[in-house]
Amino acid sequence: MPNPLYRQHIISISDLSREQLECLLQTALKLKAHPRGDLLEGKLIGSCFFEPSTRTRLSFETAVQRLGGKVIGFSDGANTSAKKGETLADTARIISGYTDAIIQRHPKDGAARVAAEFSRVPVINAGDGTNQHPSQTLLDLVTIYETQGRLDKLKIAMAGDLKYGRTVHSLCQALKRWGCEFAFVSPPSLAMPDYITEELDEAGCRYRILGSLEEAAEWADILYMTRVQRERFDEQEFAKIQGKFNLDASMLARAKPNLRVLHPLPRVDEIHPDVDATPHAYYFEQATNGVYARMAILSLVLNEEV
């Protein structure tokens, strides 16, 4: 079967068809079961992180090395010519002359598409502002499939910061292709953006607003937690909402046996450590799947056949 992702930029989940997502998913599962160390042999990958990252940067760089490739790059935009005023377009032009692909994280929405416009090699978006995080979405899909045995018509609850959380935006855009049903739990000021709910309406996917994490845990197959960021509230308002969106083990008492709790990490207070010991916790395994998801992206973008 032809590889539908060869030499393609990976910028946004909305750019990818269900066929392409399924190809990525199955390749990630295949590489997890049967690792290969030759798929990036002779390839040099640019790792360009203009803002801090732990899991995304290290898992991408791990993926490159496990596939037999090499990495050059930076982990802080302050140490690059961007500090001198070089445009992102020029940076992309230059680095694409050195490398076979560029992995980029940037604080500005839309930065990945700018880089892709001027790069001579594929650009993989490792997060651009509050916009998109497609490689996180792929590892989420791998994890959901791994725990549920399917993606079709699952019940997906999302909690916390749904307005600024790029992970939940991308995940909704992916899972709508499988006819999933959604539930949202958040402060009103951090509700899921209208453009996402409009996309769900257009896809015929039902969604509901729930008032508590207990309701979400009882209803869902997947409970996807995100961090409510203190810096978006004054202290008094934050104190009112903080505990309401923190999950502890007691809230899972009526959960279905197949429920799995996911989180893009890092967590702060929104998942109590007592959840870690429950059979529902799966966020550390989710993070591990990041390596295999990113191995799949790199392998497919840089090889005609995998």
UniProtKB/Swiss-Prot annotation:
The keyword Transport does not apply. It comes from Neisseria meningitidis serogroup C / serotype 2a (strain ATCC 700532 / DSM 15464 / FAM18). Pathway: Pyrimidine metabolism; UMP biosynthesis via de novo pathway; (S)-dihydroorotate from bicarbonate: step 2/3. It is an enzyme of class 2 (transferase). It catalyses: carbamoyl phosphate + L-aspartate = N-carbamoyl-L-aspartate + phosphate + H(+). The lineage of its organism: Bacteria, Pseudomonadati, Pseudomonadota, Betaproteobacteria, Neisseriales. GO terms for cellular component: cytosol. One of its GO terms (biological process) is 'de novo' UMP biosynthetic process. The keyword Transferase applies. The gene is pyrB. This is Aspartate carbamoyltransferase catalytic subunit. Belongs to the aspartate/ornithine carbamoyltransferase superfamily. ATCase family. It comes from the Bacteria. Keywords: Pyrimidine biosynthesis, Transferase. NCBIfam families: asp_carb_tr, PRK00856.1. Its EC number is 2.1.3.2. Catalyzes the condensation of carbamoyl phosphate and aspartate to form carbamoyl aspartate and inorganic phosphate, the committed step in the de novo pyrimidine nucleotide biosynthesis pathway. Pfam families: OTCace, OTCace_N. Heterododecamer (2C3:3R2) of six catalytic PyrB chains organized as two trimers (C3), and six regulatory PyrI chains organized as three dimers (R2).
